[in-house]
Amino acid sequence: MKTFVLFVILLCLTFLSISKSETCPFSQSLVSGASATYYTDPNAGNCGYENLMGPLGPGNLFIAALGPNLYNNGKNCGQCFNISSPYTNRSVVIMATDSCPDSGYCQRSSHFDLSTQAFDVLGAQSIGVLEGLTYYKVPCGVNGNVKIMMKDGSNDYWTAFLIYNSKVTIKDVSVKITGKSTYTSLTQSSYNYWISPNMVPGSFDVRIESVGGEFIYITIPKVESRKQYETSSQFSVDGCVGTPSGPSGGLGSPSTGASIGTPSDASSLTLYALFSLTILFLVMLN
Ligand SMILES: *[C@@H]1O[C@H](CO)[C@@H](O)[C@H](O)[C@H]1NC(C)=O
Ligand SMILES: *[C@@H]1O[C@H](CO)[C@@H](O)[C@H](O)[C@H]1NC(C)=O
């Protein structure tokens, strides 16, 4: 009887850890009452991705500029949204790549200033302003791993990092100079670069934390203006609705020595341990 009770407890714990690892790293609640306008020069937006079809951009023109509330000083840069329209009964997934500071529509709590390509899916341009839209956040359908670039004009003593090609937004970027023992958190600027004012010549580690609390690490040999690296990982989007299918987890840059350490790694370890124990108990029962 005691063994049976233990077995049931273990089974419950196992299911708990399964459901824990399948929680989307951000809220996907449906928001209604959103509106949209369009603009025609979406390149070089405030999120720092430059040309949308260039190396830092999403590789397509399905983007939006967010009003101050949604833009949130850059915190929603790189977030993707699935927006549905009652005008066409269609939906479109866009990435936030810009801010929309204009007084007027952009000051609403949920307003998207869309590229014409995205707007056209949701309604005719002649309508001007689309009202009554609904949306929810979704992971971005990017290919390969999270990437990092050091800002134009970086030098041995100052740099700023742009994190891009991520499926989810970034909560924190920290730097540890080689030989030091602690990471220092950087400040995210409103133009989406993480400012690192206390660099020294030589190598350093960067720790990138997703909004879901998952970490990606990369070692960079030295500060170099506009130098880009692909890390060896992508953030997990297990449990998210609207996860785009397609290739993911491409090849990492072999020279950078990046690695990943995640809470879900820990919970799957727990899972394996619990499974082994459960099987052990089953064997003992027989
Ligand atoms: C969209 O769907 C609603 C509800 O099903 C329907 O009444 C409306 O005619 C549809 N509109 C278009 C443009 O298809
Ligand atoms: C966007 O949301 C709508 C409504 O929930 C859904 O039907 C559609 O499949 C979603 N699109 C994508 C690409 O996830």
UniProtKB/Swiss-Prot annotation:
GO terms for cellular component: membrane. The keyword Cytoplasm does not apply. Residues 22-265 are extracellular. It is a single-pass type I membrane protein. SMART domains: DPBB_1. It is found in: Membrane. SUPFAM superfamilies: Barwin-like endoglucanases (SSF50685), PHL pollen allergen (SSF49590). Glycans are attached at residues 82, 89. Keywords: Disulfide bond, Glycoprotein, Membrane, Signal, Transmembrane, Transmembrane helix. InterPro entries: Expansin/allergen_DPBB_dom, Expansin_CBD_sf, Expansin_CellWall, Expansin_EXLX1-like, RlpA-like_DPBB, RlpA-like_sf. Residues 44-145 form the Expansin-like EG45 domain. Gene3D superfamilies: Expansin, cellulose-binding-like domain, RlpA-like domain. PROSITE patterns: EXPANSIN_EG45. Disulfide bonds join 47-77, 80-140. The chain crosses the membrane at residues 266-286. Residues 1-21 form the signal peptide. It comes from the Eukaryota. Pfam families: DPBB_1. Belongs to the expansin family. Expansin A subfamily. May serve to lubricate the movement of the cellulose microfibrils during cell growth and wall extension and/or they may serve to maintain the fluid state of the slug cell wall. This is Expansin-like protein 1. The lineage of its organism: Eukaryota, Amoebozoa, Evosea, Eumycetozoa, Dictyostelia. The gene is expl1.
